[in-house]
Amino acid sequence: MTESSGSTTIVLDFDGTITEVDLLDDLARRFGDSVVYQEVEDALLTGTITLRECITREYEPVTMPLDEAVGWVLANVRLRPGLRELVAFAKARRWSVRVLSSGFEEIIVPVLADAGVDGIDVLANRVDARSEGWRVIWRDEAVCAVCGEPCKRSGLPEGEVIYVGDGISDRCAALAARRVFATRGLARYLSERGLPHEPFDDFHDVIGALAP
């Protein structure tokens, strides 16, 4: 199926989608408190805390200076193949590309710049990297009428949305998209509910599926 031009946006999750490893998890596990990290991850999976509560508690023990964190990320991050090609593919069709993330703009923007990816919109949270513990500055406090929590759905643009994601933070937003490419936890979630989605391993798969 060919998408109509002019009002189509490819919306990309960042952690675990653009990156091969979930950096939000990796930073908290490596530079925070590993015991706290595991406790809140388990609580998130059982539904006893929200995603926001999880991220807040995981980053409270992180005291690493932000420039050191960015340096570590740039030295170690691996991006999913085909990102630049997907952005070029979208631009050639006059589609927009938006990164919509539960992570931190202060991490995402340097990663994209280092990878030579520019001219795309980034919608993410911010972080106040205090020496006594990182404090998350949430992008949007509005509660979603669908899932009952503040979520990524509020960050979706108008028009047709092609959503590409991998995890818990992508669930509600993906349900609002016209077309969904999913991997890992998001793919399992949608499959268990019989909801339509297309699997992908890298962004070349997405390009191949979208190309006329």
Locations of regions flagged by a protein language model:
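C-terminal cap/substrate-recognition subdomain and adjoining C-terminal extension
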Residues: 82-96, 103-212
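Alpha-helical substrate-recognition element adjacent to the catalytic core
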Residues: 2-126, 130
